[in-house]
Every structure is written in C-alpha cells, then in structure tokens.
From Swiss-Prot:
The keyword NAD applies. Belongs to the LDH/MDH superfamily. MDH type 1 family. The gene is mdh. It comes from Glaesserella parasuis serovar 5 (strain SH0165) (Haemophilus parasuis). It holds the Pfam family Ldh_1_N. One of its GO terms (molecular function) is L-malate dehydrogenase (NAD+) activity. This is Malate dehydrogenase.
C-alpha cells in the first residue's frame, strides 16, 4: 500500500507525516509532497524513526512522482486560518490549490481514495468531485472530506464535561465541517450506556464543538490553526481507509456524496471496504433540537457546495 500526503511541509502535513510513520501498517510506502524545498528533508527526518514504513519526499511544482501508484492520497495543502478569518475566507486561495492537485490525481492515480483536509472542506470536496468528473474518473465511493476531527473533539469535550473515560465515549457528528454545519448528535452519545445532557449542556457543547477550530486559532494568537489535532484525526482516517482497502470492515465518519437526502455531500457514518465507501450508514433518530439544527444548516451547506461546483464549472 502507498499513501501520498500533498502539503507535507505544512503544519498539518509535517505532524501527519510523523503520525503516519508511527501508525501505518508495516510495509506501507509513504510519499511526502509539497511545493516547499524543505519537503525531502521532512522525509529524511521522519525516516530516522525506526518503523517499517518507507518514506520518500518530493518538492517542486509537480506531485506526479509522489502520486504514482498511490492507494490513498491525503491533501492538506493550502493556507491556514488566521484570527478574524473563517473557513470561507480560505476559499479564494485554497480552491485553486485543490483544483490543481486533483487534476494531477485524475491523471496519475485516478483509482486512488482521496481524503481532503484542506479547508473549507464543505467546498473543496465539491471542487475535487467536479474536477474528477470532468476528467471522467469520478468515483464517489473514493472521495472523502476528512471530518473526523469533529468526532474526536466531541468525544473529548463530552468526556471532560461528564468525567468519563474518553476512550469509551462515542459521539456521532454529521453535516459538514464548519460552523453551524457541524452537528454533534449528543442524543446518541454513549459510553457503556447513553449519556444524558440537560438542554443547556447540549446548547453549550454544540456551540463549543462548532467553534473549536476558532478556539485553537485564537489561542495560537496568529501562530496557526488546529494542526496537531487535525493531523491525528487524519491519521486515524487514513488507517481506517487502509484497513478497508485490505478487506476489513471499518466504520468511520466522513463528508461524502451520499443519497442527497440533505445535500449532495454530507458527513455521516460510512462502512469502508475494498472500494472505499461500501455503505452509507443511517444517522439514526434525531432529537427535536438536532432535527431543527439539520434543517437550519442545509441552506449554508448547499451554498458551500454550490460555490465549489461553480468554481470548476463556471
């Protein structure tokens, strides 16, 4: 198996390279690519860590060598949020970066699974889909927006609030990957049993989870965005996809093109397998609060998606 990270010299990319070197199955090849000249050095640096994962780094304008033979491509290239910016402010820069990289994926490794980390994910995934479609190689089972950080944050915050063991807490998160489109289904949160919340706790937790990215941006005071936690979420996602590609049945949350019930792309539980998404899993019964929140987010989510489609198609 080969995993390629595009944007490997950035804040997320370097942390992700480290985690993948430590966590990928023995025998996996890891290719690191970035436009920055430091990238081969990042590869040399992590290659000194004693695990059976082979790492090679590539720099420059052309990601082709990194993409050749890739089974999974993770794209974290782009600019990070600064204080006062929201994820949509990133669109103007990151949209073009994602488009250009996906054009290369379409020619070099069209059957690879692709995980988009670059924000705004609600929009960049739509861009990727349209570029792949134009190239005649789009397989909706193999394109993902990596939203697993929303799940990790939800589980962490719930465990902290309720004094639970975070390893046992499970919280589904659906919708999208920014602001009001992030919806933790706290009515379905459980440890060994269902976890109960007051209405006030639900409102406060939901808001904190939705604004957790901003919490990090502000705490870093202009020095970056959520890179380390995002890298861990992406590494977990990568391991899940690879398990699926080797025949294991794995459930993960991701932003995928589904049945269009709410919007063309929607974050939900999926069963991963040999072809990427093998099955879209039901989101279960929503509370009245959650149902209202889903209906309220749909216009935002649809507008985000349309922005990406129009960027490619005019």
């Amino acid at each position: 198996m080969k995993v390629a990270v595009l944007g490997a010299a950035g804040g997320i990319g370097q942390a992700l390279a480290l985690l993948l070197k430590l966590q990928l199955p023995a025998g996996t090849n890891l290719a690191l690519y970035d436009i920055a000249p430091v990238t081969p050095g990042v590869a040399v640096d992590v290659s000194h860590i004693p695990t059976a994962v082979k790492v090679v780094g590539y720099a420059g304008e052309d990601p082709t060598p990194a993409l050749e033979g890739a089974n999974l491509v993770l794209i974290s290239a782009g600019v990070a949020r600064k204080p006062g910016m929201d994820r949509s402010d990133l669109f103007n820069i990151n949209a073009g970066i994602v488009r250009n990289l996906i054009e290369k994926v379409a020619t070099v490794c069209p059957t690879a699974c692709v995980g988009i980390i670059t924000n705004p994910v609600n929009t960049t995934v739509a861009i990727a889909a349209e570029v792949l479609k134009k190239a005649g190689v789009y397989d909706k089972r193999k394109l993902f927006g990596v939203t697993s950080l929303d799940v990790l944050r939800s589980e962490t915050f719930v465990a902290e609030l309720k004094g639970k063991d975070v390893n046992d807490v499970k919280v589904p998160v659906i919708g999208g990957h920014s602001g009001v489109t992030i919806l933790p289904l706290l009515s379905q949160a459980f440890e060994e049993d269902k976890i109960d919340f007051t209405a006030e706790e639900v409102a406060a937790l939901t808001k904190r989870i939705q604004n957790a990215g901003t919490e990090v941006v502000e705490a870093k005071a202009g020095g970056g965005s959520a890179t380390l936690s995002m890298a861990q979420a992406a590494a977990r996602f990568a391991r899940s996809v690879l398990k699926g590609l080797t025949g294991e049945q794995v459930v993960e949350y991701a932003y995928v093109e589904g049945n269009g019930e709410y919007a063309r792309f929607f974050a939900q539980p999926v069963r991963l397998g040999l072809n990427g998404v093998e099955e879209l899993l039901p989101i279960g019964t929503l509370s009245a609060y959650e149902e209202e929140a889903v209906q309220a987010m749909i216009p935002t989510l649809k507008a985000d998606i349309e922005l990406g489609e129009k960027f490619v198609n005019g």
